[in-house]
């Protein structure tokens, strides 16, 4: 969120747990993996995959996602240069990594403040294909 705000001037919301949303449409997806050292519990590695829709028009998305996906090009003319956006993402990740875990509570506070899902009804999808209505609580 910080990288997009700093490089583009746009404010995104978070759709729990790992999507960034702009104008009620998915702009970005984030996947993470964390490895801990067995005995100490210290962080061994963090792998982060970030996909930001930068230059797509609505026609570039397959019909099934056109109504729920967006890109920076649809919000800004011109869209940001990819190198500027990538540098902003790397700087934000660097800042977060350098201050974690000391700033953990601050990150959780920011996440909660930006989360569009908390306090709202949602649908819980299970691995077996079943689902049920739920309420997103902190």
Feature map (PLM): residue ranges:
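Long, positively charged amphipathic alpha-helical accessory segments at protein N-termini or as interdomain linkers
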Residues: 2-12, 22-138
């Amino acid at each position: 969120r910080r990288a997009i705000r700093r490089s583009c001037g746009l404010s995104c919301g978070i759709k729990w747990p790992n999507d960034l949303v702009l104008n009620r449409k998915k702009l970005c997806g984030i996947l993470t993996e964390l490895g801990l050292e067995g005995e100490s519990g210290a962080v061994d590695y963090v792998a982060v995959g970030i996909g930001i829709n930068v230059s797509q028009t609505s026609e570039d998305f397959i019909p099934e996602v056109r109504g729920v996906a967006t890109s920076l090009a649809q919000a800004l003319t011109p869209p940001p240069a990819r190198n500027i956006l990538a540098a902003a993402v790397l700087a934000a990740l660097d800042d977060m990594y350098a201050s974690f875990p000391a700033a953990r509570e601050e990150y959780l506070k920011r996440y909660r403040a930006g989360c569009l899902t908390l306090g709202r009804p949602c649908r819980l999808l299970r691995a077996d294909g079943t689902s049920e209505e739920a309420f997103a609580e902190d």
